[in-house]
Regions:
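Positively charged, solvent-exposed patches that mediate nucleic-acid binding
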Residues: 1-122
């Protein structure tokens, strides 16, 4: 698959939150919505509750690295937003990748589904 693009506009994030499906676990929350561009676009959100800027940026780097490992398994045409939770700060890239794989499988972005709760947004 081609390299992913980054979600940058607030309207893109809001549309993904509002219309997309979500999957969550203690480490990460994932929102996914089909897009019309045929390109994978991702956004990463880290709130101030996670810690100072150094910790938030570390979380973003780890999430990006974990997604790069799964990028080849994902099909294009999705907007995906990853929301870091408090436990993300203390986890390694492999733990986040495992969590991400389960969630993306449950949302239908990749072909694996392994016991993750999926909520459909109205």
């Amino acid at each position: 698959m081609a390299e992913y693009q980054t979600l940058k506009l607030n309207s893109d994030f809001r549309r993904t939150y509002g219309r997309g499906k979500s999957a969550a676990d203690p480490v990460l929350v994932t929102y996914a919505l089909r897009n019309r561009y045929g390109v994978m676009r991702i956004g990463i959100t880290t709130g101030k509750k996670l810690g100072n800027a150094v910790e938030r940026n570390r979380c973003r780097r780890i999430i990006r690295a974990a997604f790069r490992q799964l990028e080849g398994e994902c099909c294009g045409g999705w907007d995906i937003v990853f929301v870091a939770r408090h436990k993300t700060v203390s986890r390694k890239s492999t733990d986040i990748e495992r969590s991400m794989r389960k969630q993306l499988g449950a949302l239908g972005v990749i072909g694996i589904s392994a016991g993750v709760k999926v909520a459909q947004r109205k």
